[in-house]
């Protein structure tokens, strides 16, 4: 088999001379930190979304034409509904594997958006958006917005009671926009709500237009990551000019394929054992049946919460009235603009215009970290407020009280979160400096000649002629706080869950591990020497 593949490869290379370029690309190095896999979860979720979505399009009809249901779900037999809702029921109960695929599609959509949010939080808190990666930050924000819009259109297509309520709320927000609201509503819905062609428009946007744009932006995002090299956390041998990690072939590729399989398995498990969006319990959309408990998916819930806690501040211009929901749209627009512009805002305020390939620990940038926590608290409070009717019902609390708790909380708790986070970051910085200056606490108590007791510290570096540690500079890397991080702990025995490995296997494994460690030390020393020579040649030292 390998000989045949080699023959095919030689034939291709003789025609297209690809070996040189491919060899350089597959030798590219990627860092190994676990947080870099958060973006891959979004990528694999999108692939699963495409595969499951193609299957669902074979059976779904987005028509709003009214029909009388006569299918497998007996409680709804004889009920008038749209063809969209009827085909969604048929997919759930009559198409082989339809319910599994539909639920997997929904779970993958949630995973896609949430993983993008968490991925962008990692980018924000570690400073990976700084120059020269501002463009990738903007692409990420646009991807997040498109992912939310794609998810909203997706769960609006079945035309059930919940999706109809969501569409009606969006229709009201759009119409409430001054000057452009009516025109935007006509462009999106094709007329008054509900129009005969709105689901057809959403369907085209959901299965063709937005996925195509997302696919193109993902390709651009990955191309920029590939071209600009991956960021990495500070550490031994790591500089702004290199990347330390594993090669893309074969280790990184195998790990990525395995991680994709894990993502697929996890979503399959969720789709198989949990029910999500049980549209048969809701019935078709009927405005007279709208009630409490009408919440959207988690990534849209915060917008619903903003509409619920916003005071009824209406604007009056002559004979024209701008409803209070207008302020929700304004708030969303301001947040999107701030999110896109943040890299330039920080650069303007800090004066930092340098190229950065090394990441920052959140504790080392307390202002940014505190702003991020403040924004996260703001988002969580709005999300909780999106279900204030559920909270009020479950805990027998006044809905008006829940609304005011949300309003006051949005003012008080983000400010408290900023202050507490800032002080925590400063405290963590001082803790790192103390270890670098005095060493690691050993837990050994020593009595001095004068009777005082002190704790013995293990220095991290050299000591002076009096035995006192010489303070080490902080390099931005993780500072060890325990002795076992320096190798003082006992070596763990090798083996499986039920017993240790044979002595010969354990000895051989330890020898290999020791050889790998020596090779790593030699490689790091060579890298440091090359960096020193280059800096010396460029006049930096």
From Swiss-Prot:
Disulfide bonds: none
Principal location: membrane
Name of a matching Pfam family: Cytochrom_B_N_2
Cofactor(s) required, per the database record: heme
Spans traversing the lipid bilayer: 36-56, 109-129, 137-157, 169-189, 207-227, 256-276, 325-345, 371-391, 408-428
InterPro entries the UniProt entry points to: Cyt_b/b6_N, Cytb/b6-like_sf, Di-haem_cyt_TM
Keywords: Cell membrane, Electron transport, Heme, Iron, Membrane, Metal-binding, Respiratory chain, Translocase, Transmembrane, Transmembrane helix, Transport
Subunit structure: The cytochrome bc1 complex is composed of a cytochrome b (QcrB), the Rieske protein iron-sulfur (QcrA) and a diheme cytochrome c (QcrC) subunit.
Family of this protein: Belongs to the cytochrome b family.
PANTHER family: CYTOCHROME B (PTHR19271:SF16)
Designated name of the protein: Cytochrome bc1 complex cytochrome b subunit
Source organism per UniProt: Corynebacterium efficiens (strain DSM 44549 / YS-314 / AJ 12310 / JCM 11189 / NBRC 100395)
